[in-house]
């Protein structure tokens, strides 16, 4: 049943998925140098997982072309800090905010058999020496607090709980915070996971239905890139 529903989702979005596959292949060589430079840099860091590197090229394709540009970046789900470090290392003038519980989250989310104290300690050490805003809290609570304080961001990366309900909640709150013409990037939305009660793509699809006149999907493969247009 999981595979059938995912197949139908992919079929419905076949055009954008196909275009996204070609784009990823096309730009791979373009970001080869900066990816290698970043990979060399993180050899001295302590990362047990490097999932983010799978999407490095497409991530940078949508980030500013000028490495000196001043922009605001928020990520939900920082884990050991690899994606945040990528921004801090490659964009010295960026303003980075990270949100993570570094603890057990929604009971419907995929279980992670890790020591979260150790994960948070790695995060702190990996980003040592950089200036950024770290928020340790539930993502929806943190996002609403940022909204109350009138924060806004140019880029928001959603990589927290992959349960569809949480993806939808994070996306709705992120929409309120992202600037017009700003981007929301969703991690790992085109997958089926038997350990999750409601799949990520279901939450993503619902978000797109709610805001269909206010957003534009630019990219959809293993990650999704959405632009806020109004």
PLM regions with names:
Residues 20-67:
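Class I SAM-dependent methyltransferase Rossmann-like catalytic core
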Residues 45-49, 60-230:
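S-adenosylmethionine/decaboxylated-SAM
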Residues 3, 55-58, 83:
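Conserved alpha-helical elements of sugar-nucleotide-dependent glycosyltransferases
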Residues 6, 29-31, 228-229:
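Positively charged, low-complexity intrinsically disordered regions
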Residues 2-21:
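N-terminal auxiliary segments of SAM/dcSAM-dependent transferases
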């Amino acid at each position: 049943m999981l595979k059938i529903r995912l197949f139908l989702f992919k079929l419905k979005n076949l055009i954008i998925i196909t275009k996204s596959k070609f784009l990823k292949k096309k730009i791979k060589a373009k970001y080869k140098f900066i990816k290698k430079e970043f990979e060399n840099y993180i050899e001295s860091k302590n990362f047990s997982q490097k999932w983010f590197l799978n999407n490095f090229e497409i991530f940078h394709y949508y980030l500013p072309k000028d490495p000196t540009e001043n922009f605001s970046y928020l990520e939900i789900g920082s884990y050991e800090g690899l994606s945040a470090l990528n921004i801090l290392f490659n964009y010295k003038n960026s303003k980075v905010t990270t949100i993570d519980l570094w603890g057990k989250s929604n009971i419907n989310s995929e279980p992670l058999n890790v020591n979260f104290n150790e994960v948070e300690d790695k995060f702190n050490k990996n980003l040592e020496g950089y200036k950024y805003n770290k928020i340790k809290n539930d993502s929806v609570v943190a996002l609403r607090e940022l909204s109350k304080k009138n924060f806004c961001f140019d880029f928001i990366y959603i990589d927290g709980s992959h349960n569809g309900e949480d993806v939808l909640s994070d996306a709705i709150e992120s929409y309120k915070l992202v600037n017009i013409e700003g981007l929301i990037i969703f991690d790992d939305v085109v997958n089926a996971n038997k350990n999750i009660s409601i799949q990520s793509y279901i939450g993503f699809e619902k978000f797109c239905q709610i805001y269909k006149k206010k957003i534009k999907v630019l990219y959809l493969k293993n990650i999704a890139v959405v632009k806020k247009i109004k």
